[in-house]
UniProtKB/Swiss-Prot annotation:
Its main location: cytoplasm. Pfam families: FliW. The lineage of its organism: Bacteria, Thermotogati, Thermotogota, Thermotogae, Thermotogales. The gene is fliW. It comes from the Bacteria. This is Flagellar assembly factor FliW. NCBIfam families: PRK13285.1-1. Acts as an anti-CsrA protein, binds CsrA and prevents it from repressing translation of its target genes, one of which is flagellin. Binds to flagellin and participates in the assembly of the flagellum. Disulfide bonds: none annotated.
Amino acid sequence: MVYKTKLGEMEISDESIFTFEKGIPGFEHLRKFALVFPQETFPIGWLLSLEDPEVGLPVVDPKLVRADYDPVVLSEDLEEIEAENQEALLFFCVLTIPPGKPEKTTINLRAPIILNQKKKKGIQTILENEDYQLRHLLSEEMERSKTVV
């Protein structure tokens, strides 16, 4: 089906659509989002609202940025997305890219987007791990990961 999104009109398959029962913080009124990976921004993907074409969040697999990223998901979050455990879940973290200053891009490792691909449900949760903050400078995290791997 074709949707109007922040990135323009896009053909989006049902496999890419996730329901966020409680919305996403800041966008609690929006429930349907699509995860897409346009070639021109890969490996950065986009979590696009299918209800408001102005809403789209750049996201990335946190393991690409921080090799030792190891979130622990609370049982109530697993229940909300109907997951038995966290092994089969997909994790993405939201990027903040300041206009004209991509070198100042930050990644939110504290509040990942968690997707249950099987049930097509998602949640953004806040992790209890104090090592993960809302804003980590992307370039510093990638440099740090080189020494971890």
